[in-house]
């Protein structure tokens, strides 16, 4: 069997069957739900009807039993179910209610079981499954599998259903690849933005407020301010106008936009006033507001393109189990922009957005991958316009020599799109920037411009984000930098540590004020702790880029002894020179 990503998924899928077999041997009361392969491994959902909760000790026993099963060189055999109703009845009789439910749904799809057999042909285990699987367990190396953790998972992801126990695991072709992945997980755990969020006092999510609603603490809001300043400056340089729109709007607006038909379950509604029949909605998107601003004036081909941007906060309902730190929230700020242009301007506008994305991600030292999603089976708008739009997106990327993948049929019903997946320091990809064409909203709101021949035409509309969600992007940045923000973003850029408060505090105070007046984010650490403790805490624990130590020699020479995060001592420089160096780093966004 050729070893590639596709066959690795097959191997992992087979491992999920082996895990289910091991669990049912050790825990006969366990009932099976689903167990697919994933990009990073596999999982299986179990219902332990006696209420037992899997422990770390249980995972070790299950993993050992899996290795015993693998050693037996068992085969996987596909079996077409001849009598589906009989099989459903058997599942129910065995208490396998989840398998019975799945089979009932797929009974007209030629459903199959996969049988796990020993060398004598005895069936040791079976599972409802479409496959495929590896031929036998000899393809799996016992030292290349690892059970990772247990988590709760609602049956079918529905909070109204029973909570099951999901065992996450992974498997590789060999132990070296497994060890590399486990090392990666260790590093990812150290960088977890939820952990660093507490350690560095960056943000919190409080039960009293609600899940997925973020409190930005001063440290992280300082980072956000710097990024928003960059955002505003760059947008103005690139010809955008910046707007602000309300947090709520009448439901009628969302009926016109189509959100009430397609997005209602994700929207927050405000209770109707007793004196009015008007229903208000907390905005899930900024687009309709920008269209209304467009409508406020007459437009001709000469006034286009109109590039309109907003740091607009939106709210979208999420299931509580899906919420996670900053990366999956219910209230977030989008760096949203909508561009209204003529068809002839489309390719140039796309190119300018791609430049914007590339320039921005370069600042954060992030690469990116690109995907083009094309027309789905169900779509709105004219087929010719779709073909022109897709051709325009391809042309813009092809002219730049950009590599991109095509997701056929994966575009939104209202237009094709380009997605940019940024790569962080660990090589993980995150969905951030998007360019989305929209044939739906311009028609729904009947927006027009006057063309050269005097006729009224519908403009091309582009939705565009660079960061996506500000909350999500900051979560990504925390992990990308492992909390050690570069100087221009660091909440505190310099810590000043006097060796002796009695002898050196006055000069340290002077240096502190001079740096503060220069616009540097600086703190004076005049606590009674030891000098080494304060240096270590600043550089390692609080991840401050620079520490300036002040003693007798520094006072004599009007200088500071500089320690740099990740480097250590870098020498003594004059106060003015140090300030100039920091100012340059900040200006260069280093």
Locations of regions flagged by a protein language model:
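NTP/phosphate- and nucleic-acid-binding module
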Residues: 1-31, 39, 45-590
